[in-house]
Amino acid sequence: MPKVRILILTSSTGGGHDARAEAFADWCFRLYRHDVDVRIERMLEKSSLVNRAGVNFYNRIQASAPWVHKAFYAVIELLSILNKDTVSFGKRYYLKVLTEYRPHLVFSVHDCLNRGYFQLARKILGADKVRCATYCGEFSGGWGYSRNWIEPSVDLYISRTRTAQDFALKRGIPAEKCLVRGYLMQPQAHFEIIPPKEREAFREQRLGLKRDLFTVFLATGGNGANNHFELLPSLVERADQCQAIFICGRNKQAYNDLVHWRSSHPEFNCYIEGYSETVHLLMQVSDVIVTRGGTATCAKALHFKCPIIFNATGGIMPQEELTWKY
């Protein structure tokens, strides 16, 4: 029996889409081993200079001026018109992937990779040869829930919450194609659980922190957008009452600066990590997490019942408003 081939469409706008793509791939291997062949494609940035520029601009303003996203989001919504029934930018590369890989399932985890992409896959491979599915990671509906998510011809539309599904139904997704799946996280987030009685020991032995001091987790997405240094003065003032865990994503400069800062402030207990593969463990030993409204981080925090302090410095992005509202 030939392997089932699954093409996952994602893009590194923020870190949540890639995290869900990787989680889905990990679950496929854990459940089906070598019977399923999964290929992850960062389709936007790999397919076109225009798309790549858009991704880079998205990440740049996320880090420095989140308020600009209100205008940028409105521009991106126009893709729903350009990609009504085919792919406008990056079509040549997408066709190359389709004809070479010939997937049985095209699975999108990104709002800009549904409309047009599903129609083109059916046209090239045959409507009876390929199925198309979407996992939408939004928490709720309204301004910020991109119309690019909504492709009524989808074979299966998976929502994170019932609230988000209700909005998708109103926007045109047929009810018989809808499913609420919940959080799409990597397997280890479900299986690597620290018992409550062992959490203090984890802080001390694995992180070098004090066992019983209030622990604040300053998080960031995979791309490393953060304002840790703006929050440090308030934490240092309370060095006898709290300690901190910092992660920096792929922001090497932020990591280097924090390491240097730590060497000059021995009075404050903190643990610093760059791109972390153990966020699910760090959350379990934290008393509170400070984060923006990114869906992946907030989903993990809710899953592990870690209280969230939302970081609105620089403004709230439209997509983040959906998380805040939920």
Residue ranges of predicted features:
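Nucleotide-activated sugar donor-binding and catalytic core shared by glycosyltransferases
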Residues: 1-326
